[in-house]
Amino acid sequence: MTVDALTQPHHLLSLAWNDTQQHGSWFAPLVTTSAGLLCLLLYLCSSGRRSELPVFNPKTWWELTTMRAKRDFDANAPSWIESWFSQNDKPIRFIVDSGYCTILPSSMADEFRKMKELCMYKFLGTDFHSHLPGFDGFKEVTRDAHLITKVVMNQFQTQAPKYVKPLANEASGIITDIFGDSNEWHTVPVYNQCLDLVTRTVTFIMVGSKLAHNEEWLDIAKHHAVTMAIQARQLRLWPVILRPLVHWLEPQGAKLRAQVRRARQLLDPIIQERRAERDSCLAKGIEPPRYVDSIQWFEDTAKGKWYDAAGAQLAMDFAGIYGTSDLLIGGLVDIVRHPHLLEPLRDEIRTVIGQGGWTPASLYKLKLLDSCLKESQRVKPVECATMRSYALQDVTFSNGTFIPKGELVAVAADRMSNPEVWPEPAKYDPYRYMRLREDPAKAFSAQLENTNGDHIGFGWHPRACPGRFFASKEIKMMLAYLLIRYDWKVVPNEPLQYYRHSFSVRIHPTTKLMMRRRDEDIRLPGSL
Protein backbone atom coordinates (compact mmCIF):
# COMPACT_ATOMS: atom_id res chain seq x y z
CA MET A 1 0.00 0.00 0.00
CA THR A 2 1.29 3.46 -0.87
CA VAL A 3 0.71 6.15 1.73
CA ASP A 4 0.10 9.61 0.40
CA ALA A 5 2.75 12.11 1.45
CA LEU A 6 0.16 14.46 2.88
CA THR A 7 -0.81 11.87 5.50
CA GLN A 8 2.73 11.38 6.78
CA PRO A 9 3.86 12.30 10.28
CA HIS A 10 5.92 15.47 10.52
CA HIS A 11 9.32 13.80 10.44
CA LEU A 12 8.47 12.30 7.07
CA LEU A 13 6.56 15.24 5.76
CA SER A 14 9.67 17.35 6.27
CA LEU A 15 11.36 15.31 3.57
CA ALA A 16 8.74 16.31 1.02
CA TRP A 17 8.42 19.41 -1.10
CA ASN A 18 5.77 20.70 1.31
CA ASP A 19 8.70 21.93 3.40
CA THR A 20 8.74 25.11 1.38
CA GLN A 21 5.71 26.18 3.41
CA GLN A 22 7.85 26.25 6.56
CA HIS A 23 9.90 29.17 5.30
CA GLY A 24 7.15 31.71 5.06
CA SER A 25 5.43 33.35 2.13
CA TRP A 26 8.71 34.71 0.74
CA PHE A 27 10.29 31.31 0.11
CA ALA A 28 8.31 29.83 -2.77
CA PRO A 29 8.01 32.98 -4.93
CA LEU A 30 11.67 33.83 -4.46
CA VAL A 31 12.95 30.37 -5.27
CA THR A 32 10.58 30.09 -8.23
CA THR A 33 11.62 33.41 -9.74
CA SER A 34 15.33 32.90 -9.07
CA ALA A 35 15.37 29.37 -10.41
CA GLY A 36 13.35 30.32 -13.45
CA LEU A 37 15.56 33.22 -14.46
CA LEU A 38 18.71 31.18 -13.89
CA CYS A 39 17.40 28.21 -15.88
CA LEU A 40 16.40 30.51 -18.74
CA LEU A 41 19.84 32.14 -18.73
CA LEU A 42 21.64 28.79 -18.67
CA TYR A 43 19.45 27.46 -21.46
CA LEU A 44 20.09 30.47 -23.67
CA CYS A 45 23.83 30.37 -23.00
CA SER A 46 24.28 26.62 -23.23
CA SER A 47 25.80 24.96 -26.24
CA GLY A 48 26.53 21.44 -27.30
CA ARG A 49 24.44 18.42 -28.04
CA ARG A 50 21.34 17.78 -25.94
CA SER A 51 19.61 14.52 -25.15
CA GLU A 52 16.89 13.55 -27.62
CA LEU A 53 15.13 11.20 -25.21
CA PRO A 54 11.54 12.06 -24.28
CA VAL A 55 10.86 13.51 -20.84
CA PHE A 56 8.25 11.59 -18.87
CA ASN A 57 7.19 14.55 -16.72
CA PRO A 58 7.94 17.68 -18.79
CA LYS A 59 7.06 21.16 -17.72
CA THR A 60 4.41 22.89 -19.75
CA TRP A 61 5.22 25.82 -22.02
CA TRP A 62 3.73 28.36 -19.61
CA GLU A 63 5.65 27.16 -16.53
CA LEU A 64 8.63 29.33 -15.67
CA THR A 65 10.30 26.60 -13.59
CA THR A 66 10.31 22.82 -13.25
CA MET A 67 9.06 22.97 -9.65
CA ARG A 68 5.75 21.26 -10.38
CA ALA A 69 7.47 18.51 -12.37
CA LYS A 70 9.93 17.89 -9.54
CA ARG A 71 7.13 17.73 -7.01
CA ASP A 72 5.24 15.24 -9.17
CA PHE A 73 8.32 13.06 -9.52
CA ASP A 74 8.81 12.94 -5.77
CA ALA A 75 5.23 11.78 -5.30
CA ASN A 76 5.04 9.29 -8.18
CA ALA A 77 8.54 8.10 -9.09
CA PRO A 78 8.26 4.40 -8.14
CA SER A 79 4.95 3.89 -9.96
CA TRP A 80 6.09 5.92 -12.99
CA ILE A 81 9.34 4.01 -13.34
CA GLU A 82 7.62 0.65 -12.87
CA SER A 83 4.94 1.59 -15.40
CA TRP A 84 7.43 2.72 -18.04
CA PHE A 85 9.83 -0.20 -17.82
CA SER A 86 7.10 -2.82 -17.61
CA GLN A 87 6.24 -1.83 -21.19
CA ASN A 88 9.51 -0.44 -22.56
CA ASP A 89 13.08 -1.71 -22.62
CA LYS A 90 14.51 1.70 -23.45
CA PRO A 91 15.69 4.78 -21.52
CA ILE A 92 13.49 7.64 -20.43
CA ARG A 93 14.29 11.03 -18.91
CA PHE A 94 12.70 12.51 -15.81
CA ILE A 95 12.82 15.91 -14.18
CA VAL A 96 14.04 15.19 -10.64
CA ASP A 97 14.97 17.49 -7.78
CA SER A 98 18.53 17.97 -9.06
CA GLY A 99 17.59 18.51 -12.72
CA TYR A 100 17.25 16.03 -15.58
CA CYS A 101 17.93 12.36 -14.98
CA THR A 102 18.13 9.65 -17.63
CA ILE A 103 16.98 6.31 -16.26
CA LEU A 104 18.20 3.27 -18.15
CA PRO A 105 16.56 -0.14 -18.31
CA SER A 106 18.45 -2.82 -16.43
CA SER A 107 19.34 -4.40 -19.78
CA MET A 108 21.87 -1.54 -20.11
CA ALA A 109 23.29 -1.96 -16.60
CA ASP A 110 26.30 -4.02 -17.66
CA GLU A 111 27.55 -1.35 -20.04
CA PHE A 112 26.64 1.42 -17.59
CA ARG A 113 28.59 -0.03 -14.66
CA LYS A 114 31.82 -0.20 -16.68
CA MET A 115 31.77 3.43 -17.85
CA LYS A 116 34.38 5.51 -16.04
CA GLU A 117 32.86 8.65 -17.54
CA LEU A 118 29.84 8.15 -15.24
CA CYS A 119 30.86 9.09 -11.70
CA MET A 120 29.02 8.10 -8.53
CA TYR A 121 31.30 10.28 -6.39
CA LYS A 122 30.24 13.29 -8.46
CA PHE A 123 26.62 12.48 -7.62
CA LEU A 124 27.36 12.24 -3.90
CA GLY A 125 29.37 15.46 -3.87
CA THR A 126 26.91 17.47 -5.98
CA ASP A 127 23.56 16.35 -4.61
CA PHE A 128 24.81 16.38 -1.02
CA HIS A 129 26.66 19.71 -1.28
CA SER A 130 30.04 18.43 -0.10
CA HIS A 131 31.55 21.93 -0.35
CA LEU A 132 29.25 23.35 2.34
CA PRO A 133 29.89 23.17 6.11
CA GLY A 134 27.71 20.57 7.78
CA PHE A 135 28.04 18.14 4.88
CA ASP A 136 31.51 17.18 6.08
CA GLY A 137 30.76 13.47 5.73
CA PHE A 138 30.22 13.79 2.01
CA LYS A 139 33.28 15.99 1.68
CA GLU A 140 35.35 13.16 3.15
CA VAL A 141 33.60 10.55 0.97
CA THR A 142 34.42 12.44 -2.22
CA ARG A 143 38.06 13.26 -1.45
CA ASP A 144 40.42 11.86 -4.08
CA ALA A 145 42.02 9.53 -1.51
CA HIS A 146 38.69 7.65 -1.16
CA LEU A 147 39.78 6.60 2.31
CA ILE A 148 36.27 5.57 3.38
CA THR A 149 35.87 3.19 0.45
CA LYS A 150 39.25 1.63 1.20
CA VAL A 151 38.39 1.08 4.86
CA VAL A 152 34.99 -0.42 4.09
CA MET A 153 36.21 -2.68 1.28
CA ASN A 154 39.43 -3.82 2.94
CA GLN A 155 39.37 -3.51 6.71
CA PHE A 156 35.75 -4.51 7.26
CA GLN A 157 36.47 -7.66 5.28
CA THR A 158 39.84 -8.69 6.66
CA GLN A 159 38.94 -7.83 10.27
CA ALA A 160 35.67 -9.80 10.27
CA PRO A 161 37.11 -12.78 12.21
CA LYS A 162 38.05 -10.35 14.99
CA TYR A 163 34.82 -8.35 15.22
CA VAL A 164 32.00 -10.83 14.52
CA LYS A 165 31.92 -12.38 18.00
CA PRO A 166 32.22 -9.14 20.04
CA LEU A 167 29.68 -7.48 17.76
CA ALA A 168 27.25 -10.38 18.29
CA ASN A 169 27.73 -10.13 22.06
CA GLU A 170 27.06 -6.39 21.94
CA ALA A 171 23.95 -6.91 19.80
CA SER A 172 22.70 -9.50 22.30
CA GLY A 173 22.71 -7.00 25.15
CA ILE A 174 21.21 -4.22 23.02
CA ILE A 175 18.34 -6.46 21.91
CA THR A 176 17.47 -7.36 25.50
CA ASP A 177 17.58 -3.68 26.43
CA ILE A 178 15.33 -2.59 23.54
CA PHE A 179 12.89 -5.50 23.16
CA GLY A 180 12.68 -6.60 26.79
CA ASP A 181 11.70 -9.93 28.38
CA SER A 182 7.90 -9.78 28.58
CA ASN A 183 6.34 -13.19 27.88
CA GLU A 184 2.94 -11.63 27.17
CA TRP A 185 1.87 -10.76 23.64
CA HIS A 186 2.23 -7.02 23.07
CA THR A 187 2.43 -4.65 20.10
CA VAL A 188 5.72 -2.89 19.47
CA PRO A 189 6.84 -0.09 17.10
CA VAL A 190 9.25 -2.44 15.37
CA TYR A 191 10.55 0.17 12.92
CA ASN A 192 11.76 2.48 15.68
CA GLN A 193 13.12 -0.39 17.74
CA CYS A 194 15.07 -1.86 14.84
CA LEU A 195 16.43 1.58 13.96
CA ASP A 196 17.71 1.97 17.52
CA LEU A 197 19.16 -1.55 17.40
CA VAL A 198 21.07 -0.87 14.19
CA THR A 199 22.26 2.54 15.39
CA ARG A 200 23.70 1.16 18.60
CA THR A 201 25.19 -1.94 16.98
CA VAL A 202 26.79 -0.03 14.09
CA THR A 203 28.16 2.59 16.47
CA PHE A 204 29.90 -0.10 18.54
CA ILE A 205 31.99 -1.27 15.60
CA MET A 206 32.50 2.24 14.24
CA VAL A 207 33.78 4.13 17.28
CA GLY A 208 34.26 1.50 19.99
CA SER A 209 32.58 0.94 23.33
CA LYS A 210 33.36 4.35 24.84
CA LEU A 211 31.32 6.38 22.36
CA ALA A 212 28.93 3.52 21.57
CA HIS A 213 27.43 4.00 25.03
CA ASN A 214 27.44 7.80 24.89
CA GLU A 215 23.82 8.94 24.48
CA GLU A 216 24.82 12.23 22.86
CA TRP A 217 26.91 10.48 20.21
CA LEU A 218 24.11 7.96 19.57
CA ASP A 219 21.66 10.82 19.08
CA ILE A 220 23.95 12.42 16.49
CA ALA A 221 24.55 9.10 14.75
CA LYS A 222 20.81 8.47 14.48
CA HIS A 223 19.60 11.93 13.51
CA HIS A 224 22.44 13.54 11.55
CA ALA A 225 21.60 11.53 8.43
CA VAL A 226 17.97 12.71 8.50
CA THR A 227 18.98 16.33 9.05
CA MET A 228 21.45 16.07 6.18
CA ALA A 229 18.88 14.53 3.82
CA ILE A 230 16.33 17.25 4.61
CA GLN A 231 18.81 20.09 4.15
CA ALA A 232 20.28 18.61 0.98
CA ARG A 233 16.83 18.37 -0.57
CA GLN A 234 15.88 21.89 0.47
CA LEU A 235 19.08 23.33 -1.00
CA ARG A 236 18.45 21.59 -4.31
CA LEU A 237 15.38 23.80 -4.62
CA TRP A 238 17.63 26.81 -5.01
CA PRO A 239 19.89 27.90 -7.87
CA VAL A 240 23.42 26.65 -7.28
CA ILE A 241 24.84 30.15 -6.88
CA LEU A 242 22.48 30.93 -3.97
CA ARG A 243 22.88 27.68 -2.02
CA PRO A 244 25.83 28.76 0.17
CA LEU A 245 23.87 31.82 1.34
CA VAL A 246 20.65 29.88 1.90
CA HIS A 247 22.55 27.22 3.83
CA TRP A 248 23.54 29.82 6.42
CA LEU A 249 19.96 31.08 6.76
CA GLU A 250 18.12 27.74 6.92
CA PRO A 251 17.30 26.34 10.41
CA GLN A 252 18.22 22.85 9.20
CA GLY A 253 21.59 24.18 8.06
CA ALA A 254 22.31 25.55 11.53
CA LYS A 255 21.25 22.24 13.07
CA LEU A 256 23.48 20.33 10.68
CA ARG A 257 26.55 22.43 11.48
CA ALA A 258 25.88 22.11 15.21
CA GLN A 259 25.75 18.32 14.93
CA VAL A 260 29.09 18.26 13.15
CA ARG A 261 30.69 20.57 15.72
CA ARG A 262 29.49 18.41 18.58
CA ALA A 263 30.60 15.23 16.83
CA ARG A 264 34.11 16.67 16.57
CA GLN A 265 34.10 17.64 20.24
CA LEU A 266 33.16 14.09 21.25
CA LEU A 267 35.42 12.22 18.82
CA ASP A 268 38.60 14.31 18.68
CA PRO A 269 39.71 13.62 22.29
CA ILE A 270 39.48 9.87 21.65
CA ILE A 271 41.50 10.18 18.44
CA GLN A 272 44.16 12.29 20.17
CA GLU A 273 44.29 9.93 23.16
CA ARG A 274 44.86 6.92 20.91
CA ARG A 275 47.52 8.67 18.86
CA ALA A 276 49.36 9.75 22.01
CA GLU A 277 49.13 6.19 23.36
CA ARG A 278 50.51 4.82 20.10
CA ASP A 279 53.39 7.29 19.98
CA SER A 280 54.28 6.63 23.62
CA CYS A 281 54.36 2.86 23.09
CA LEU A 282 56.48 3.15 19.96
CA ALA A 283 58.93 5.45 21.76
CA LYS A 284 59.34 2.76 24.43
CA GLY A 285 59.68 -0.02 21.89
CA ILE A 286 56.33 -1.50 22.93
CA GLU A 287 53.70 -2.75 20.51
CA PRO A 288 50.74 -0.30 20.70
CA PRO A 289 47.33 -1.72 21.62
CA ARG A 290 45.04 -2.40 18.69
CA TYR A 291 41.32 -1.70 18.83
CA VAL A 292 38.66 -3.58 16.92
CA ASP A 293 36.77 -0.61 15.50
CA SER A 294 36.83 1.66 12.49
CA ILE A 295 38.73 4.40 14.34
CA GLN A 296 41.68 2.02 14.37
CA TRP A 297 41.13 1.01 10.76
CA PHE A 298 40.99 4.59 9.51
CA GLU A 299 44.23 5.35 11.34
CA ASP A 300 45.87 2.26 9.83
CA THR A 301 44.68 3.04 6.31
CA ALA A 302 45.55 6.76 6.44
CA LYS A 303 49.16 5.89 7.42
CA GLY A 304 49.78 9.23 9.05
CA LYS A 305 48.22 11.34 6.30
CA TRP A 306 45.55 13.87 7.22
CA TYR A 307 41.88 12.93 6.97
CA ASP A 308 38.70 14.24 8.55
CA ALA A 309 38.01 11.66 11.27
CA ALA A 310 34.65 13.13 12.30
CA GLY A 311 33.54 13.51 8.69
CA ALA A 312 34.49 9.90 8.03
CA GLN A 313 32.46 8.63 10.98
CA LEU A 314 29.40 10.71 10.07
CA ALA A 315 29.59 9.38 6.53
CA MET A 316 29.78 5.82 7.85
CA ASP A 317 26.69 6.42 9.98
CA PHE A 318 24.81 7.89 7.01
CA ALA A 319 25.62 4.86 4.88
CA GLY A 320 25.43 2.20 7.56
CA ILE A 321 22.30 2.90 9.58
CA TYR A 322 19.22 3.63 7.47
CA GLY A 323 19.79 1.23 4.58
CA THR A 324 20.70 -1.55 7.00
CA SER A 325 17.65 -0.78 9.14
CA ASP A 326 15.33 -0.96 6.14
CA LEU A 327 16.57 -4.42 5.13
CA LEU A 328 16.50 -5.68 8.73
CA ILE A 329 12.93 -4.49 9.23
CA GLY A 330 11.81 -5.64 5.79
CA GLY A 331 13.37 -9.06 6.32
CA LEU A 332 11.78 -9.47 9.74
CA VAL A 333 8.35 -8.34 8.54
CA ASP A 334 8.43 -10.68 5.54
CA ILE A 335 9.36 -13.62 7.76
CA VAL A 336 6.62 -12.81 10.27
CA ARG A 337 4.07 -12.49 7.46
CA HIS A 338 5.05 -16.04 6.43
CA PRO A 339 4.99 -17.78 9.84
CA HIS A 340 5.78 -21.21 8.37
CA LEU A 341 9.36 -19.91 8.07
CA LEU A 342 9.91 -19.33 11.78
CA GLU A 343 10.75 -22.88 12.84
CA PRO A 344 12.93 -23.77 9.82
CA LEU A 345 14.91 -20.57 10.43
CA ARG A 346 15.22 -21.30 14.14
CA ASP A 347 16.41 -24.82 13.38
CA GLU A 348 19.07 -23.42 11.04
CA ILE A 349 20.23 -20.88 13.62
CA ARG A 350 20.34 -23.46 16.42
CA THR A 351 22.38 -25.85 14.31
CA VAL A 352 24.79 -23.44 12.65
CA ILE A 353 25.53 -21.07 15.54
CA GLY A 354 25.25 -23.85 18.10
CA GLN A 355 27.99 -25.80 16.36
CA GLY A 356 30.24 -23.08 15.01
CA GLY A 357 29.60 -20.08 17.24
CA TRP A 358 29.75 -16.52 15.98
CA THR A 359 32.20 -16.59 13.07
CA PRO A 360 32.09 -15.33 9.47
CA ALA A 361 31.96 -18.98 8.36
CA SER A 362 28.87 -19.62 10.49
CA LEU A 363 27.10 -16.56 9.13
CA TYR A 364 27.83 -17.81 5.61
CA LYS A 365 26.13 -21.10 6.47
CA LEU A 366 22.84 -19.41 7.42
CA LYS A 367 21.64 -20.10 3.90
CA LEU A 368 17.89 -19.96 4.45
CA LEU A 369 18.16 -16.70 6.37
CA ASP A 370 20.41 -15.32 3.62
CA SER A 371 17.86 -16.38 0.99
CA CYS A 372 14.99 -14.76 2.89
CA LEU A 373 16.85 -11.45 3.08
CA LYS A 374 17.87 -11.45 -0.57
CA GLU A 375 14.27 -12.18 -1.56
CA SER A 376 13.01 -9.34 0.64
CA GLN A 377 15.45 -7.03 -1.11
CA ARG A 378 14.30 -8.26 -4.52
CA VAL A 379 10.59 -7.83 -3.78
CA LYS A 380 11.10 -4.40 -2.19
CA PRO A 381 14.43 -2.79 -3.19
CA VAL A 382 15.31 0.30 -1.20
CA GLU A 383 15.36 2.37 -4.41
CA CYS A 384 13.40 2.04 -7.66
CA ALA A 385 16.46 3.23 -9.62
CA THR A 386 19.98 2.88 -8.36
CA MET A 387 23.69 3.55 -8.99
CA ARG A 388 23.02 7.24 -9.72
CA SER A 389 26.00 8.94 -11.34
CA TYR A 390 26.84 12.15 -13.18
CA ALA A 391 28.30 12.21 -16.66
CA LEU A 392 31.76 13.78 -16.50
CA GLN A 393 31.66 14.22 -20.28
CA ASP A 394 29.30 13.47 -23.14
CA VAL A 395 28.60 9.73 -23.20
CA THR A 396 27.07 7.59 -25.94
CA PHE A 397 26.02 4.00 -25.27
CA SER A 398 26.37 1.24 -27.84
CA ASN A 399 22.65 1.47 -28.67
CA GLY A 400 22.99 5.19 -29.40
CA THR A 401 21.63 6.51 -26.10
CA PHE A 402 23.29 9.89 -25.49
CA ILE A 403 23.93 11.37 -22.04
CA PRO A 404 25.15 15.00 -22.09
CA LYS A 405 27.92 16.10 -19.76
CA GLY A 406 26.64 17.07 -16.33
CA GLU A 407 23.42 15.07 -16.50
CA LEU A 408 22.37 12.51 -13.93
CA VAL A 409 21.90 8.89 -14.99
CA ALA A 410 20.63 5.83 -13.10
CA VAL A 411 19.53 2.24 -13.72
CA ALA A 412 15.99 1.06 -13.04
CA ALA A 413 15.46 -1.95 -10.78
CA ASP A 414 12.97 -3.39 -13.28
CA ARG A 415 14.80 -6.67 -13.85
CA MET A 416 14.21 -7.68 -10.23
CA SER A 417 10.49 -7.93 -10.97
CA ASN A 418 10.74 -9.25 -14.53
CA PRO A 419 8.76 -12.52 -14.98
CA GLU A 420 11.18 -13.60 -17.71
CA VAL A 421 13.97 -13.56 -15.12
CA TRP A 422 12.13 -14.48 -11.93
CA PRO A 423 9.10 -16.83 -12.03
CA GLU A 424 6.16 -15.30 -10.14
CA PRO A 425 8.10 -12.11 -9.40
CA ALA A 426 5.40 -10.61 -7.17
CA LYS A 427 5.52 -13.66 -4.90
CA TYR A 428 7.80 -13.70 -1.87
CA ASP A 429 9.63 -17.01 -2.26
CA PRO A 430 12.04 -17.38 0.69
CA TYR A 431 13.67 -20.48 -0.80
CA ARG A 432 14.33 -18.88 -4.20
CA TYR A 433 18.01 -18.10 -3.65
CA MET A 434 18.61 -21.15 -1.49
CA ARG A 435 17.66 -23.28 -4.49
CA LEU A 436 19.94 -21.24 -6.75
CA ARG A 437 22.87 -21.88 -4.41
CA GLU A 438 22.56 -25.58 -5.29
CA ASP A 439 23.60 -24.70 -8.87
CA PRO A 440 27.41 -24.23 -8.95
CA ALA A 441 27.07 -21.70 -11.76
CA LYS A 442 24.69 -19.53 -9.71
CA ALA A 443 25.79 -20.23 -6.14
CA PHE A 444 28.00 -17.14 -5.87
CA SER A 445 25.52 -14.56 -7.18
CA ALA A 446 22.69 -16.14 -5.16
CA GLN A 447 24.24 -14.92 -1.90
CA LEU A 448 22.90 -11.72 -0.34
CA GLU A 449 26.20 -9.85 -0.41
CA ASN A 450 27.02 -10.63 -4.05
CA THR A 451 25.62 -8.80 -7.05
CA ASN A 452 24.79 -9.37 -10.70
CA GLY A 453 22.56 -7.85 -13.35
CA ASP A 454 19.48 -9.79 -12.26
CA HIS A 455 19.55 -8.41 -8.70
CA ILE A 456 20.85 -4.88 -8.17
CA GLY A 457 19.51 -4.31 -4.67
CA PHE A 458 23.06 -3.41 -3.62
CA GLY A 459 23.97 -2.09 -7.07
CA TRP A 460 26.32 -4.05 -9.31
CA HIS A 461 30.09 -4.30 -8.98
CA PRO A 462 32.05 -2.07 -9.36
CA ARG A 463 29.16 0.29 -8.53
CA ALA A 464 27.85 -1.88 -5.70
CA CYS A 465 27.48 -0.74 -2.10
CA PRO A 466 30.90 -1.35 -0.52
CA GLY A 467 29.35 -1.91 2.91
CA ARG A 468 27.12 -4.79 1.84
CA PHE A 469 29.45 -7.45 3.26
CA PHE A 470 29.34 -5.92 6.73
CA ALA A 471 25.60 -5.22 6.49
CA SER A 472 24.90 -8.84 5.57
CA LYS A 473 26.77 -10.15 8.61
CA GLU A 474 25.26 -7.61 10.97
CA ILE A 475 21.66 -8.19 9.86
CA LYS A 476 21.99 -11.96 10.17
CA MET A 477 23.34 -11.60 13.72
CA MET A 478 20.46 -9.39 14.80
CA LEU A 479 17.77 -11.49 13.12
CA ALA A 480 19.18 -14.68 14.64
CA TYR A 481 18.71 -13.25 18.14
CA LEU A 482 15.29 -11.78 17.34
CA LEU A 483 13.94 -15.05 15.93
CA ILE A 484 15.34 -17.33 18.63
CA ARG A 485 14.42 -15.14 21.60
CA TYR A 486 10.97 -13.96 20.56
CA ASP A 487 7.69 -15.13 19.09
CA TRP A 488 6.32 -12.82 16.42
CA LYS A 489 3.05 -12.25 14.61
CA VAL A 490 1.41 -9.52 12.56
CA VAL A 491 -0.93 -7.00 14.11
CA PRO A 492 -4.50 -7.94 13.07
CA ASN A 493 -6.07 -5.74 10.39
CA GLU A 494 -2.88 -3.73 9.91
CA PRO A 495 -1.60 -4.09 6.33
CA LEU A 496 2.04 -3.61 5.44
CA GLN A 497 2.73 -0.05 4.32
CA TYR A 498 5.60 1.52 2.42
CA TYR A 499 6.75 5.10 2.33
CA ARG A 500 7.52 6.07 -1.26
CA HIS A 501 9.25 9.34 -2.00
CA SER A 502 11.36 10.17 -5.04
CA PHE A 503 13.67 7.19 -5.70
CA SER A 504 13.19 5.73 -2.22
CA VAL A 505 10.88 2.88 -1.25
CA ARG A 506 11.07 2.30 2.50
CA ILE A 507 9.27 0.30 5.14
CA HIS A 508 6.86 2.76 6.76
CA PRO A 509 8.07 4.18 10.10
CA THR A 510 4.72 3.41 11.75
CA THR A 511 5.18 -0.33 11.13
CA LYS A 512 4.28 -2.47 14.16
CA LEU A 513 4.42 -6.17 15.03
CA MET A 514 3.28 -8.27 17.97
CA MET A 515 5.86 -10.13 20.02
CA ARG A 516 6.59 -12.00 23.25
CA ARG A 517 9.67 -13.51 24.86
CA ARG A 518 10.36 -17.19 24.22
CA ASP A 519 12.03 -19.46 26.76
CA GLU A 520 15.08 -19.97 24.54
CA ASP A 521 18.31 -18.26 23.66
CA ILE A 522 21.21 -18.92 21.32
CA ARG A 523 23.49 -21.55 22.83
CA LEU A 524 27.09 -21.33 21.76
CA PRO A 525 29.56 -24.24 21.64
CA GLY A 526 30.51 -25.32 25.16
CA SER A 527 27.46 -23.73 26.83
CA LEU A 528 25.20 -25.87 29.02
UniProtKB/Swiss-Prot annotation:
Disruption phenotype: Loss of lovastatin biosynthesis. Accelerates degradation of lovastatin precursors. Residues 45-528 are lumenal. Keywords: Endoplasmic reticulum, Glycoprotein, Heme, Iron, Membrane, Metal-binding, Monooxygenase, Oxidoreductase, Signal-anchor, Transmembrane, Transmembrane helix. It is an enzyme of class 1 (oxidoreductase). Disulfide bonds: none annotated. It is found in: Membrane; Endoplasmic reticulum membrane. Lovastatin acts as a hypolipidemic agent that works as inhibitor of (3S)-hydroxymethylglutaryl-coenzyme A (HMG-CoA) reductase (HMGR) which reduces HMG-CoA to mevalonate and is the key step in cholesterol biosynthesis. Lovastatin, simvastatin and related compounds are widely used to treat hypercholesteremia and reduce the risk of cardiovascular disease. Furthermore, statins such as lovastatin were found to be anticancer agents. The chain crosses the membrane at residues 24-44. It catalyses: dihydromonacolin L carboxylate + reduced [NADPH--hemoprotein reductase] + O2 = monacolin L carboxylate + oxidized [NADPH--hemoprotein reductase] + 2 H2O + H(+); monacolin L carboxylate + reduced [NADPH--hemoprotein reductase] + O2 = monacolin J carboxylate + oxidized [NADPH--hemoprotein reductase] + H2O + H(+). Heme binds at C465. Belongs to the cytochrome P450 family. Dihydromonacolin L monooxygenase; part of the gene cluster that mediates the biosynthesis of lovastatin (also known as mevinolin, mevacor or monacolin K), a hypolipidemic inhibitor of (3S)-hydroxymethylglutaryl-coenzyme A (HMG-CoA) reductase (HMGR). The first step in the biosynthesis of lovastatin is the production of dihydromonacolin L acid by the lovastatin nonaketide synthase lovB and the trans-acting enoyl reductase lovC via condensation of one acetyl-CoA unit and 8 malonyl-CoA units. Dihydromonacolin L acid is released from lovB by the thioesterase lovG. This is Dihydromonacolin L monooxygenase LovA.
